[in-house]
Amino acid sequence: MAITAAMVKDLRETTGAGMMDAKKALTETNGDMEAAIDWLRTKGLAKAAKKSGRVAAEGLVGVAVRAGRGVAVELNSETDFVAKNADFQQLVRDITNVALDAATDVEVLKATHLNGRPVDDVLTDAIARIGENMTLRRLHALEGDTIVSYVHNAAAEGMGKIGVLVALKGDAAKAQEIGKQIAMHIAATNPASLSEADLDPALVEREKSVLSEQARESGKPEAVIEKMIEGRMKKFFEEVTLLGQKFVINPDVTVAQAAQEAGVEVTGYARVVVGEGIEKKEEDFAAEVAKTRAGA
């Protein structure tokens, strides 16, 4: 596979590796970006990299909670201007509240009635009225004894660019207090899972493979290498799992310890970021102006 300058640039931006190292990594892995990241890491030429998932789509995440159930709904728009529109925000609010009743996924939500009509039809009308394409993209529902919500970069009450839900059990008042702090922590740190047991096995295996290769590059005895791998995997679990992470409000304890000290237990969470994983075309403003003038 031909290695292009754009591929090298993307890999450098993702890993911080030098140009020649990035090119060699892509050559060694036949242009496979994820494999190239791992190759650089095994050579100690890149930091552990999370999947890039550039956020490009606009819109809002709406969150709502009622009687032990919470939902986070993502409604995308083409521009941030429309996301600030009062009609659009009311649509997010209405759809989020409808989702609270029983919706379990986006397709169910689209068929659910809002003011006597399917949500999908209401959305079609809004597209025609507001004049911009919109997509009802994701719905996360969470249930538990106590559900706490948090919105980061709020555009209006109950909606913003990042929506978080946390499920807890224990004393309701204490759960509300610590739950809000944990929700803010989740918004900031983006954990991969609640606990080690919930992690994607493929992610764990990939990390272990990279760390094993790194350890063996040291040339130390096998017994020492095994200890190195064990220690590094322990650190990995602490960094990517919610319960294992250092609590941002008080880094002297983990999230699990903070919850335990408050007399509650975290049983689940959801984190939704507007446009997460969607890549939209970057517009060259100067070229766009030139094109417009040429056509005038």
From Swiss-Prot:
GO cellular component: cytoplasm
InterPro entries: EF-Ts_dimer_sf, Transl_elong_EFTs/EF1B, Transl_elong_EFTs/EF1B_dimer, Transl_elong_Ts_CS, UBA-like_sf
Subcellular location: Cytoplasm
Database matches in Gene3D superfamilies: 1.10.286.20, DNA helicase RuvA subunit, C-terminal domain, Elongation factor Ts, dimerisation domain
Highest taxon, organism lineage: Bacteria
Keyword GTP-binding on entry: no
Disulphide bridges, residue numbers: none
GO molecular function term, any single one: translation elongation factor activity
Pfam families documented for this protein: EF_TS (PF00889)
Ranges for region Involved in Mg(2+) ion dislocation from EF-Tu: 79-82
Family annotation (HAMAP family): EF_Ts
Family in the record: Belongs to the EF-Ts family.
Protein's name according to its UniProt entry: Elongation factor Ts
Name of the gene encoding the protein in the UniProt record: tsf
